[in-house]
Amino acid sequence: MARIAGVDIPNDKRVVISLTYVYGIGLATSKKILAAAGISEDVRVKDLTSDQEDAIRREIDSIKVEGDLRREVNLNIKRLMEIGSYRGIRHRRGLPVRGQNTKNNARTRKGKATAIAGKKK
């Protein structure tokens, strides 16, 4: 397995797919990286030369990925919570942030439903 940006990417997959295993690199970014490095998308990771791997690493170094990106996202969320914006309050309460209804659904954000005691008829 090749190690790129601190992540072991699978050898048997195409490079364009394998790069998406790195946090912050999706399919579109992966294609841009390979185009800039001058590498075909159809090449398998195990067939890459060390020069090609180095070219990919150089391109990825110019992009914010993995730990740096996670840290930035978390800092942005903390900033929203500190300034007391609506989105920050929703994050703090563990509710959906992007305007979804919460009357019936939103179980992923709210957690498991708890029974209300003494509500028998």
Curated annotation (Swiss-Prot):
Signal peptide: none annotated. Disulfide bonds: none annotated. It comes from the Bacteria. GO terms for cellular component: cytosol; small ribosomal subunit. One of its GO terms (molecular function) is rRNA binding. InterPro entries: Rbsml_uS13_C, Ribosomal_uS13, Ribosomal_uS13-like_H2TH, Ribosomal_uS13_bac-type, Ribosomal_uS13_CS. Pfam families: Ribosomal_S13 (PF00416). Keywords: Ribonucleoprotein, Ribosomal protein, RNA-binding, rRNA-binding, tRNA-binding. One of its GO terms (biological process) is translation. The keyword Repeat does not apply. Residues 93-121 are annotated as: Disordered. Residues 106-121 have a biased composition (Basic residues). Belongs to the universal ribosomal protein uS13 family. Located at the top of the head of the 30S subunit, it contacts several helices of the 16S rRNA. In the 70S ribosome it contacts the 23S rRNA (bridge B1a) and protein L5 of the 50S subunit (bridge B1b), connecting the 2 subunits; these bridges are implicated in subunit movement. Contacts the tRNAs in the A and P-sites. Part of the 30S ribosomal subunit. Forms a loose heterodimer with protein S19. Forms two bridges to the 50S subunit in the 70S ribosome. HAMAP family: Ribosomal_uS13. This is Small ribosomal subunit protein uS13. The gene is rpsM.
